[in-house]
């Protein structure tokens, strides 16, 4: 019986564990530094908004893991020793494996802004971020203004969370339209208007220069790069994208790029070591996809695929047609196949677009 160790208990790692258990009696250990039990990251916003409790974000009851003979271990992995087939924890403890799956996800980008590590500066990626937000922005008395930096999905979700408690929000987006690296121009403009209708101060073509501190080391204000304007605030949300969480692998001998380099079978350059999810980087992009795809749906598919290989049925990762979905404010967004933004639009690509004259509904077909 082999010992399969999985670092990371997000959707990729947990899916791999579940499917390995369905197809084998191998020993499985999931290691996480964040929380003992798997939870839905996309549901964290609804905890803050009062729609559910944190325990409701856990898809599986606590007894599920023991019943299915999946061991859970909390600890921060500081290094991997591939030739000894051991992982090393920050406290010096080690854990041996026969096969290792790296599913450590991603972490928020930081660009060296002065003040980016002050109290009151946070992302919205982890359970600890939710706890910070409750501490620094419990209501609009403790937090009379928040500034969010970064015009993607996590940024707008954080804005929606804060507005649910009537906290004023200034939203800094460096592009000239919200999410225009993904959305066609008409859809992006529609969402700009929708954001403003929800009383969010949307600042397009705007970059952060500096986060300023009060005398206690807490956020006091931000400075705008283009104008020098100072915006006073109690909370700053840094949501300017993510990068693979792989710093602990730099001395391991595992081939790294922006992420952990893998082939079509999700194998690294070292036998019996694999990578899946946000931290995995394909040597060559599959079709029109990106080399790294930090998307829930692809993470789940990678976990399912790799489980087959681990259990002796070597299977190539073939994600098929692109699909993604999101919900924020009153907008529900879904995409099937390849619909490019104006920035990424192909030379011979044509759009058919329909938009409801009154309601914020639209359809785009690319051909």
Task: Enumerate the language-model features and the residues they cover.
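Rossmann-like NAD(P)H-binding beta-loop-alpha module
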Residues: 132-183, 219
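Mid-to-C-terminal Rossmann-like scaffold of FAD/NAD(P)H-dependent oxidoreductases
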Residues: 2, 9, 279-367
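FAD-binding beta-loop-beta segment adjacent to the flavin cofactor pocket
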Residues: 108, 263-274, 350-360
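Glycine-rich Rossmann-fold phosphate-binding loop(s) that bind the pyrophosphate
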Residues: 8-11, 125, 150-152
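A Rossmann-like FAD-binding core segment of flavoenzymes
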Residues: 26-27, 71-88, 95, 164-262
